[in-house]
Amino acid sequence: MAVTVEEFKEQLNHSIINADVVKIFDNLLTIAVESDASDVHIEAFEDYCRMRLRMDGELVELVQYPKSLHESIISKFKIESGQMRPDERRLPQDARVSTMTLTNKEIDLRASTL
């Protein structure tokens, strides 16, 4: 039986509660691919952070999470890119990478930090 996008969202929320950055990363990419999202936006605000997906031209909020997890999540993306420096927070960085999702789909992604 295939796992649905809703089940991956539940897993993402569970990963956030447990502060499991590896699972947050894996579930976020899988949800994005399975939802046919063109973009993933990870945004920090003063009191919280959020993840949004661009689907059919619209940004849709996926989840909010505590600001205490933000640096770890961004660092995970930078490390997985293999081309970004996790310790660089002042300058924008770009990378391209091919990876596999939890559903064994190969994806090509471009990551940018601002």
Feature map (PLM): residue ranges:
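N-terminal "pre-motor" subdomain/linker immediately upstream of P-loop NTPase catalytic cores
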Residues: 2-114
